[in-house]
């Protein structure tokens, strides 16, 4: 019979747990508590909802940072409120505890090993290693040396109302705005009435926001309500706009005025590096207005599933802010009836820096491909190239592959199955497709040794609308 051996708790751990049961616990008592006991005891107090102990432990917290987000994933609003109550005492009293060091309450949803490190240290007695493994505190430069407490938070506005934790926090912040600084670096708006969004934005220091994602089915009149706030995001580095539509009740004159008001805000975004626009219908015929207001060199530009005019592509190729792009994604923009000379010029401009290129589902046909091949073959930094969903024949595909042969950094290539792979009714002929892949594999291996090439087929009955296959005849990649 096997016997399990249970390691007895360390004396320090037992002493700490007895403190949590002490109804007369005081800050003065905690000031004598070894630093290494604070994190594991705080976790236990939080999980057991020892509210009075939490209030006092916050007041005697011996670290600059309290990363609370991993703990509030447990349903314990009462414990969260106790932490805020403890902070209240710190913010309002004139004399603070001797060992109090707390400067940052961190509620960001990031990978956090603070609690794990200290828990393992408690179990093994390796407190020296725990101290070495602590992450440096992330400050907010704007408020350094001013308010005694900075609260870091990520705002995900995805429902009609806020979750109970965020509601509790924002109410607490609203009542103490002069005593602390609310810093939000990431803002996601995924669905909420704008009147609620407005009240939240008024509480946040907009200078702190570095990333914004708006993924709502907004029409232009709603966009006008967000526009004034955009201009105040002076440290914004990443902007994602998705599903912006033009209301049928908006006249062309009104549309032009609204787009002008919106795009001129980009003149103030002097830190912007990444711009993502998906299904943004008002760009059609107005892309030049936005591009002319960019004041920084973008690293990432994705304009996907939008309708653009040929003149929009021309303006894009002439924009000085795109010359240092590392990522260019134009997937879902129909280019079938357009000249690809602007795209050729664009690729020539970014050839020295471009690492990722996505031209999926652009409707590019055989007669258009030659226009971009010379420029594409000079993108020596390119590591990913996707060309799926474009109806090209075997000869064009072979020509395309021969031009990417000199791109030594290319790690992943995705191409459409040639049109010869399909029958007259548009369904995939598996035997023919297998033969084509075998022929391509032989030719490609003769030219070079690619790291990975995948071929995409449409309308696959077994694996959904789109399936990917390696060069090997029997290898399927979902």
From Swiss-Prot:
Gene Ontology molecular function terms on file: ubiquitin-like ligase-substrate adaptor activity
Organism per entry: Homo sapiens
InterPro entries hit by this protein: LRR_dom_sf, PRAME, PRAME_domain
Protein name: PRAME family member 11
Organism taxonomic ancestry: Eukaryota, Metazoa, Chordata, Craniata, Vertebrata
Keyword Chloroplast belongs to the record: no
CC annotations in GO: Cul2-RING ubiquitin ligase complex; cytoplasm
GO annotation, biological process: negative regulation of apoptotic process; negative regulation of cell differentiation; negative regulation of DNA-templated transcription; positive regulation of cell population proliferation; proteasome-mediated ubiquitin-dependent protein catabolic process
SUPFAM superfamilies according to UniProt: RNI-like
Family in the record: Belongs to the PRAME family.
Positions of LRR repeats: 99-126, 181-205, 206-232, 233-268, 269-294, 295-326, 327-347, 351-378, 379-403
This protein's UniProt keywords: Leucine-rich repeat, Repeat
